[in-house]
């Protein structure tokens, strides 16, 4: 297995981990915890009783960015799988990288918005759902770099293939 294929495989694995962490973060209700209970993007639980959170603009932006980040991340991973499996395919790694970087940017926007909204509250602590979102960010960015580097290797190989010199 060459360097290009190793980078592509690594990018797929990293994007899979990022997507699992993003889905876990988005779906669970442990973004913050208080003395009385915990809350997430969808529900707030106090003393064991959970209810829907009333619509707030900042929270709506966070939810939208998280859902879009998951969707864009899954599309990027599927594109990466197609590149890895279809050797003759002319799909470029730059597009896959762009999708993975966009997913990371949307994730970063969601997490910063949620942090700004809740950082100044007393007796509110961020919990594991929130931190799994932050943990997904470097995986998404690293996956994008893997596909970008693999594409650069492919471009350089194509560029020097016409030269009679054996490197």
UniProtKB/Swiss-Prot annotation:
InterPro entries: PMP-22/EMP/MP20-like, PMP22/EMP/MP20/Claudin, PMP22_EMP_MP20. It is found in: Membrane. GO terms for cellular component: plasma membrane. Its main location: membrane. Keywords: Membrane, Transmembrane, Transmembrane helix. The keyword Metal-binding does not apply. It is a multi-pass membrane protein. It comes from the Eukaryota. The chain crosses the membrane at residues 7-27, 59-79, 96-116, 134-154. Belongs to the PMP-22/EMP/MP20 family. This is Claudin domain-containing protein 2. The lineage of its organism: Eukaryota, Metazoa, Chordata, Craniata, Vertebrata. The gene is CLDND2.
């Amino acid at each position: 297995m060459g360097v290009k294929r190793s980078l592509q495989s690594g990018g797929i694995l990293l994007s899979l981990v990022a997507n699992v962490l993003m889905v876990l973060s988005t779906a669970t209700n442990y973004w913050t915890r208080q003395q009385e209970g915990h809350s997430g993007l969808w529900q707030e639980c106090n003393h064991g009783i959970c209810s829907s959170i009333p619509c707030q603009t900042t929270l709506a932006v966070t939810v939208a960015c998280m859902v879009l980040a998951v969707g864009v991340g899954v599309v990027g991973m599927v594109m990466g799988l197609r590149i890895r499996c279809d050797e003759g395919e002319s799909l470029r790694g730059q597009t896959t990288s762009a999708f993975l970087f966009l997913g990371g940017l949307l994730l970063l926007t969601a997490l910063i918005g949620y942090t700004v909204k809740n950082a100044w509250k007393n007796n509110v602590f961020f919990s594991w759902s929130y931190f799994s979102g932050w943990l997904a960010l470097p995986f998404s960015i690293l996956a994008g770099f893997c596909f970008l580097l693999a594409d650069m290797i492919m471009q350089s190989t194509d560029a020097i293939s016409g030269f009679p010199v054996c490197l």
